Curated annotation (Swiss-Prot):
GO cellular component, one term: plasma membrane
Protein name listed in UniProt: Adenosylcobinamide-GDP ribazoletransferase
Taxonomy, superkingdom: Bacteria
A GO term, aspect molecular function: adenosylcobinamide-GDP ribazoletransferase activity
Annotated PANTHER family: ADENOSYLCOBINAMIDE-GDP RIBAZOLETRANSFERASE
Protein's job: Joins adenosylcobinamide-GDP and alpha-ribazole to generate adenosylcobalamin (Ado-cobalamin). Also synthesizes adenosylcobalamin 5'-phosphate from adenosylcobinamide-GDP and alpha-ribazole 5'-phosphate.
Source organism of the structure: Shigella dysenteriae serotype 1 (strain Sd197)
Length: 247
């Protein structure tokens, strides 16, 4: 299990992980790593939350929120934000399915992708600022949001098909079973309940699950399945929806 965790940490983040810690794990077994997603999200959110807490006393709430969002993006290498931008460029192009998938593969940033990035990043900064001004625990909120959003991404993997012939998303999409999905969602729910007691966290998770499930169905209808880009989009939007649900 430890090798699986370190392999997933190096796969979906840019945090430095010694290669020997995940040696011996075949790439074809990476799908089992879905159950570590909430824990990885917990770690990322906690680091981002600590950045907020340290900077808040020095430069105030808005700048602390800005830098916490920036640190979160840097830790993932902008991986999920890139998926969000590519997904929006493709889906909102209003072209054929095949053309949408081609656009999503294009490394150039389009208008819709740029607008999506601006909206999501600004929305996160504003929501974090508002939560802080209301006295909500930012470290716990960010840790829970990142854990839940990555856990809920399993909803776009279980019983979904990969929309392309090959790609990184093919490691997970359509490869996880019901037990893995339930364990992943269960871990995310536990983290949300412990970090944000009084059912506040669980209620926010339910709202996020509904939103991401609907998103998954819309993407399935539009693209014929899911891709690594749509998983990234789901994680980014999941974080935002969870934080909004805490307001």
């Amino acid at each position: 299990m430890s090798k699986l965790f370190w392999a997933m940490l190096s796969f979906i983040t840019r945090l430095p992980v010694p290669r020997r810690w995940s040696q011996g794990l075949d790439f074809e077994h990476y799908s089992r790593g879905i159950i570590t997603f909430p824990l990885i999200g917990l770690l990322l959110g906690a680091i981002s939350g600590l950045v907020f807490m340290v900077l808040q006393a020095w430069c105030g709430v808005p700048l602390a929120a800005l830098f916490s969002v920036l640190v979160l993006a840097l830790m993932t290498g902008g991986f999920h934000l890139d998926g969000l931008a590519d997904t929006c460029d493709g889906v909102f192009s209003a072209r054929s399915r095949d053309r949408m998938l081609e656009i999503m593969r294009d490394s150039r940033l389009g208008t819709h992708g740029g607008l999506a990035l601006i909206f999501v990043v600004l929305a996160k900064i504003l929501v974090l600022s508002e939560l802080a001004l209301r006295g909500e625990p930012i470290l716990a909120s960010l840790a829970a949001a990142c854990a839940v959003s990555r856990g809920i991404a399993a909803l776009l993997m279980y019983r979904h098909r990969y929309a392309r012939e090959e790609g990184l998303g093919n490691v997970f999409i359509g490869k996880i079973d019901g037990r893995q999905t339930c364990v992943t969602l269960g871990l995310a729910a536990i983290f949300a309940a412990v970090l944000l007691p009084g059912m506040h966290g669980v209620a926010a998770m339910v709202v996020t699950m509904v939103a991401i499930f609907i998103l998954g169905q819309l993407l399935k209808r539009t693209l014929g399945g899911q891709t690594g880009d749509t998983l990234g989009a789901a994680i980014e939007l999941g974080e935002l929806v969870f934080l909004l649900a805490l307001l």
